[in-house]
Amino acid sequence: QAIISVIGSDMSRFPTDRHISSWAGLCPGDNESAKKRKSGKTRKGNALLRTTLITCAHAAVKNKKSYFYAQYMRISAHRGPKRAYVAVAHSMLISIYHILKDGVIFKDLGADYYNQFNKERKINAYLKKLKALGWEVPVVAA
């Protein structure tokens, strides 16, 4: 209710999901110079919407069988928990935008989404690590 009271139910004022995330102050910063990438601060946006979404992200991460938990674990390992919560809040806002604009039903991708994504790539990476450790492993499909 708090989210809809802030953004409204009419999404025609936001042409794309990037516009609403920028308005909310949840768009990721991207500063690149000479092939060096530095993350920037998120811009000032609607404080009520931002804090509400980050609070919702805290709650969504508690369910260990959800896509948001998998996203949080993947990002927090490298970037830290606070940035991971902001990233989850950003994903939630994009989902809310498409639910309100297009009328689609939310479908949770599940916690194993990232494991199924690029399965071949992960297999090759693990085989390469084992080979570097001196192990030769035959590959047999299960």
What are these regions (language model features)?
Residues 34-39, 71-75, 79-90, 95-142:
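Low-complexity, acidic/Ser/Thr- and charged residue-rich accessory regions of DNA metabolism proteins
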